């Protein structure tokens, strides 16, 4: 029973997560118990009733408040924290436990050297500090009625290359005996709180970096899955004082969403020297996420979050999404209410590589056809569609092995020597012909990664944050172009398009909506010109933009359908 201020705060934190229908299905698939069908009672005969029937129960609400399945998460509490700060963190851990996520916590103190001192007395002092941290965490968890278990035994071992050659590459590993401490706690719904220690080859317990213990746990918990308790971790949570991973493109504000397969090396290369002072553990936590997620399921994620953002923990569990969609307009992210701050968390996924293909010879037509037909549930007119692309292709962005794709064409090109572009429009239209994500990848971040790559190649080109590491991309070099596309008026995806477009209009027959994203570089130049020329605001339609929407509608309206009748 949830009562008092703590219970109200718990319910409020769930409501603030605002899960979508897809988020709800994802949460239910992981944490709700399977619903057995009783044949004898599956279709009861209708019987008269004198009283009102009780309202139907909501399965998401039931699963959130009464979870049956318990899933583990790896958590690093990276202190030092004051009592008030640590209590706030433990309150979040207690809420996660109520929702079915049992935290396997490793305490850390980034004010201590990462490895144990060679001086015996100093080493003992450091060990006493981290042991006290374990006791503090257990105390505050218990205060919030979260069953917790301090684990002072050593669960990890430092591999001896001569005696354990198979484990030597890992450096630190967890054996079945050590894993039993975690298994028993998770099986009983308790939160194990571990020391960052390991046994060396001489059976001496030594303090080691917490990251090495977490990496060893991620490997062992994902490998030893034969027991009744499934220990495969669903989340990695790093709670620190720094906040998320700083972004070069956002001038030091955090990354919202990181696609490790595409961005890992790039983030390391663009990490600025001054961030070593403001975010001294950012890169080590990025390496930690990369290593742990390599062992975890595809849908798993890592969250790097400040202790000042406790609500992000529950939002991440329920939605498995970043605090803000990374594909939203940059101005909306940095200027609107609820904008990005230093404390905004960074969500990290394994992700998929991103490629930009600029010729039909690079495109796998069979795989693209399968993606489009599966996503749209329609049959592609292959001959007509690919013949048109041979003449009009601008580029194709491909995520992974065609898990998603964006096809852009150049429309309104000269058809004869006498052809003349409309005034103020001296180039073809950059038209988003197809945008598709395979159903198996919907909800796992692929759509955001795809849209961000599309933005960087079109309307965001020329901006600092368009410098991305995608294979074949323009790396931010060039001049941005307006991006235009159309969608059926009754398409449920239009709500998503409204949030990302600069504007839209209905066609005369009202069957379509034409959307567009204005080139950010051009808008920035207009804004600066107005700012230094008297402060006049940018008009809804600037002089150089007059007539463009009418031209777009005419040209796009003439594009034939890509689908078979």
Swiss-Prot record:
Its EC number is 2.3.1.1. It catalyses: L-glutamate + acetyl-CoA = N-acetyl-L-glutamate + CoA + H(+). One of its GO terms (biological process) is L-arginine biosynthetic process. GO terms for molecular function: L-glutamate N-acetyltransferase activity. Its main location: mitochondrion. InterPro entries: AceGlu_kinase-like_sf (IPR036393), Acyl_CoA_acyltransferase (IPR016181), GNAT_dom (IPR000182), Vertebrate-like_GNAT_dom (IPR006855). Residues 38-58 are annotated as: Disordered. Keywords: Acyltransferase, Amino-acid biosynthesis, Mitochondrion, Transferase, Transit peptide. Pathway: Amino-acid biosynthesis; L-arginine biosynthesis; N(2)-acetyl-L-ornithine from L-glutamate: step 1/4. Residues 352-540 form the N-acetyltransferase domain. It holds the Pfam family NAT. Coiled coil: none annotated. The keyword Cytoplasm does not apply. GO terms for cellular component: mitochondrial matrix. It comes from the Eukaryota. N-acetylglutamate synthase involved in arginine biosynthesis. PANTHER family: AMINO-ACID ACETYLTRANSFERASE, MITOCHONDRIAL, N-ACETYLGLUTAMATE SYNTHASE. Belongs to the acetyltransferase family. This is Amino-acid acetyltransferase, mitochondrial. The lineage of its organism: Eukaryota, Fungi, Dikarya, Basidiomycota, Agaricomycotina.
């Amino acid at each position: 029973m949830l009562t008092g201020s703590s219970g109200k705060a718990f319910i409020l934190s769930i409501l603030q997560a605002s899960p979508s229908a897809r988020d709800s299905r994802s949460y239910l698939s992981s944490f709700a118990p399977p619903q057995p069908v009783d044949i004898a009672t599956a279709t009861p005969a209708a019987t008269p009733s004198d009283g009102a029937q009780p309202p139907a129960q909501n399965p998401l609400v039931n699963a959130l408040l009464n979870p049956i399945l318990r899933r583990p998460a790896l958590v690093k509490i990276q202190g030092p924290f004051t009592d008030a700060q640590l209590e706030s963190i433990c309150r979040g851990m207690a809420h996660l436990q109520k929702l079915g996520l049992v935290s396997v916590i490793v305490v850390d103190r980034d004010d201590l050297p990462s490895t144990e001192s060679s001086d015996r007395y100093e080493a003992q002092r450091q060990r006493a500090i981290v042991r006290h941290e374990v006791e503090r965490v257990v105390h505050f968890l218990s205060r919030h009625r979260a069953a917790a278990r301090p684990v002072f035994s050593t669960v990890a071992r430092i591999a001896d290359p001569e005696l354990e050659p198979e484990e030597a590459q890992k450096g630190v590993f967890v054996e079945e005996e050590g894993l039993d401490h975690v298994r028993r706690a998770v099986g009983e719904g308790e939160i194990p709180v571990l020391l960052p220690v390991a046994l060396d080859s001489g059976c001496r317990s030594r303090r080691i970096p917490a990251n090495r213990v977490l990496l060893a746990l991620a490997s062992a918990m994902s490998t030893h899955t034969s027991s009744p308790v499934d220990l495969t971790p669903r989340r990695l949570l790093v709670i620190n004082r720094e906040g998320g991973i700083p972004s070069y493109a956002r001038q030091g504000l955090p990354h919202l969403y990181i696609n490790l397969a595409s961005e890992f090396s790039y983030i390391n290369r663009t990490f600025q020297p001054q961030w070593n002072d403001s975010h001294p553990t950012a890169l080590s936590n990025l390496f930690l996420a990369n290593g742990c997620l390599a062992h975890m399921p595809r849908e798993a994620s890592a969250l790097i979050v400040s202790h000042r953002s406790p609500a992000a923990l529950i939002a991440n569990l329920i939605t498995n999404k970043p605090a803000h969609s990374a594909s939203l307009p940059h101005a909306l992210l940095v200027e609107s209410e609820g904008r990005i701050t230093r404390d905004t968390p960074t969500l990290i996924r394994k992700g998929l590589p991103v490629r930009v293909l600029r010729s039909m010879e690079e495109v796998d037509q069979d795989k693209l056809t399968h993606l489009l037909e599966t996503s749209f549930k329609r049959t592609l007119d292959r001959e007509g569609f690919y013949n048109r692309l041979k003449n009009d292709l601008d580029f194709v962005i491909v995520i992974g092995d065609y898990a998603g794709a964006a096809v852009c064409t150049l429309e309104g090109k000269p058809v004869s020597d006498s052809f003349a572009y409309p005034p103020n429009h001296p180039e073809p239209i950059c038209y988003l012909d197809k945008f598709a994500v395979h159903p198996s990848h919907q909800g796992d971040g692929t759509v955001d990664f795809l849209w961000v790559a599309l933005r960087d190649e079109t309307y965001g080109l020329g901006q600092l944050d368009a410098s991305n590491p995608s294979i074949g991309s323009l790396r931010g070099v060039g001049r941005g172009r307006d991006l235009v596309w159309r969608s059926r008026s009754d398409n449920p995806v239009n709500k998503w398009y409204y949030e990302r477009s600069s504007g839209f209009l209905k066609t005369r027959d009202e069957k379509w909506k034409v959307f567009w994203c204005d080139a950010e570089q051009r808008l920035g130049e207009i804004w600066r010109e107005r700012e230094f020329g008297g402060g006049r605001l940018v008009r809804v339609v600037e002089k150089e933009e007059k007539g463009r929407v009418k031209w777009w509608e005419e040209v796009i309206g003439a594009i034939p359908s890509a689908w078979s009748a």
